[in-house]
Amino acid sequence: MSNEYVIGIDLGTTYSCLAYIDEEGDPIVEKNFEQEDTTPSVILFNENGEIIVGSPAKDMAIMYPMERVVTAIKRQIGTDYEVDIDGDKYTPITLSAAILRKMINDFNDNHGVEVKRAVITCPAYFGQTERDATKTAGKVAGLEDVTIINEPTAAAISFGFGAGAGEKKRVMVYDLGGGTFDVTVLDIDGSAFTAVATDGERLLGGKDWDQVLIKIIKQKVCEENDIEESELEDDDDVKQSLILDSETIKKRLSSAESTKGTLTVGG
């Protein structure tokens, strides 16, 4: 039964998602162990040598030094970036594999299978090095057959932009994610999708909005409490709190013009 399912994985900068096609031919987003549709792309190395991935890692991040928490590893895929944890070195491939493995294991546990085949999405502008690294991460995570598909193509298929037999169309896909931004023009001929042009900024996404909010929060905290910004910079707990809270604040500001929050400094 290992080949009963072929899964699709959106390996994202800030959140990742897994889906499959059910017996009726409908796409189903798989819930992880925490009963969430998406898994935070966060990795925590605790003091016992455990590698924790997803919401538990994100929730506990504030309790650990920043160097034991890895986020946005997708931005480093295909590079020689390394993380040293207790003398062990982890690459973007092995770190990405940890995220993939968590989602795959949750799927296997939910369905009582051992899935070995998957389609993993990547930005259209990824070169061969990044694509190969993503595929290798899938293999390290336990997959045997990994296919890489461009994110704009996956989005077009998902939203039903396919053309009928003999029909042609051109669409533009705007993809603003947690860590990357790109716009791709696709030519669709029946079931064939061809990227005509793509451009964007690989270091622009939701996390950068978070960083702007962090800067604003720091300024306001310092102004209203007559403290130096260096006091915030030297406090790891404050920095971790700002990283976590900025995302929550950003979400609130998506539907409100203002919001409030708390920040404990030196307490």
Question: For each of these PLM feature ranges, what is it?
Answer:
Residues 1-79, 83-85, 89, 105-267:
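Oxyanion-binding/catalytic loops of NTP- or PPi-dependent enzymes
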Residues 88-98:
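Conserved AMP-binding/adenylate-forming core of the ANL superfamily
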Residues 97-107:
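Short, well-ordered amphipathic alpha-helical segments that serve as non-catalytic structural scaffolds
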